Design a protein with these regions (language model features):
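Short helix-loop boundary/capping segments
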Residues: 135, 148, 160-210
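N-terminal beta-strand/beta-hairpin edge segment
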Residues: 35-116, 124-127, 131-172
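Residues that act as N-cap/strand-start positions at coil-to-secondary-structure junctions
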Residues: 104, 148, 179, 234-236
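Extracytoplasmic/luminal low-complexity segments enriched in Pro/Gly and acidic/polar residues
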Residues: 186-266
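Short, surface-exposed charged micro-motifs
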Residues: 151-153, 182-184, 237-239
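Short amphipathic alpha-helical segments
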Residues: 17-26, 109, 113-126, 207-215, ...
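A short, surface-exposed beta-strand/turn
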Residues: 77-89, 179-191, 264-266
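Hydrophobic membrane-targeting and insertion signals
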Residues: 1-74, 255-266
Length: 266
């Protein structure tokens, strides 16, 4: 979720508090969203220039390499973003939070490496979130008695498949249980992620088919991007390419002016 917040903050950052949008100002605002940046280029198309005073920006293009998130131990190998026309209320800049007159639309392309994703999976923030998800889940996906997850690892495979494993620790077992998942991942209608031909085992024993179907159904529901529409965000996946070593994603984003995600800079 932090990555989504950063993308939106980057779009908001192109509008300077004083009401002047220029390439360097926009680049500095976007750069401030990351702890380290190897390469970053920003171009703001704003012709004729007087449109800016009316609260209009024709287009913003962002291209970055090796961008390290501030709050998570995660690096984005490639970030490319291009907006449609941005139209906002100039008087709203006094609150340092532009009020948009029309939906904010952008295309984005991301590349993440397997190594960087594994660093994120092994971070305390992710493990704590995984533990909370398990405790708060009343479905068959919950593992009773589990007190901790450890050593998660993902591997990208050919043909949009992946393998994932994690150790499941509890107070009764001295040796942790090992959960392994091998599955494809497809996109249905650009909005629904679905696991394809999944294989799940616990300490080498395959899950019973009925139990596995319940787990997969729960996961697929969580991976439905339409769940975000209630918060004013529409997202459509245009490209999903997983291969050994890296994952490439291209998507279209549309945020309504009332979207709660536009409140991230308050």
């Amino acid at each position: 979720m932090e990555l989504l917040t950063i993308l939106i903050s980057s779009l908001l950052g192109v509008v300077a508090p004083v009401g002047v949008v220029i390439d360097q100002t926009a680049e500095n605002a976007i750069r401030s969203q990351f702890s380290t940046v190897e390469q970053l280029q920003v171009r703001v198309d704003n012709a004729p220039s007087y449109q800016l005073l009316q609260g209009k920006v024709e287009r913003v293009l962002i291209a970055g390499r090796s961008l390290q998130l501030k709050q998570q131990d995660f690096r984005i190998a490639v970030l490319e973003l291009e907006t449609d026309q941005i139209e906002f209320d100039p008087s709203s800049l006094k609150q340092n939070l532009p009020k948009f007159k029309q939906p904010l639309q952008a295309g984005v392309r991301l590349v993440v490496t397997e190594q960087d994703l594994n660093k994120l999976l092994q971070s305390p923030q992710f493990l704590n979130g995984l533990r909370k998800l398990n405790k708060g889940n009343s479905s068959a996906f919950q593992f009773a008695g589990a007190s901790n997850f450890a050593n998660p690892k993902v591997e990208f495979l050919p043909n949009n498949r992946f393998s994932f494993q994690v150790e499941l620790q509890n107070d009764q077992e001295v040796i942790p249980l090992l959960i392994k998942i091998n599955s494809g991942l497809s996109i249905v209608g650009g909005r629904q992620f679905q696991l394809v031909d999944p294989e799940v085992s616990l300490d080498g024993q395959e899950f019973p088919a009925e139990f596995l179907n319940l787990i997969i159904s729960n996961i697929n529901q969580q991976l439905d991007l339409r769940n975000l529409e209630g918060d004013g965000l529409q997202m459509r996946i245009l490209k999903w390419k997983m291969k050994p070593g890296k994952l490439e994603i291209a998507a279209f984003l549309r945020l309504e002016p009332s979207s709660k995600f536009l409140e991230t800079r308050r």
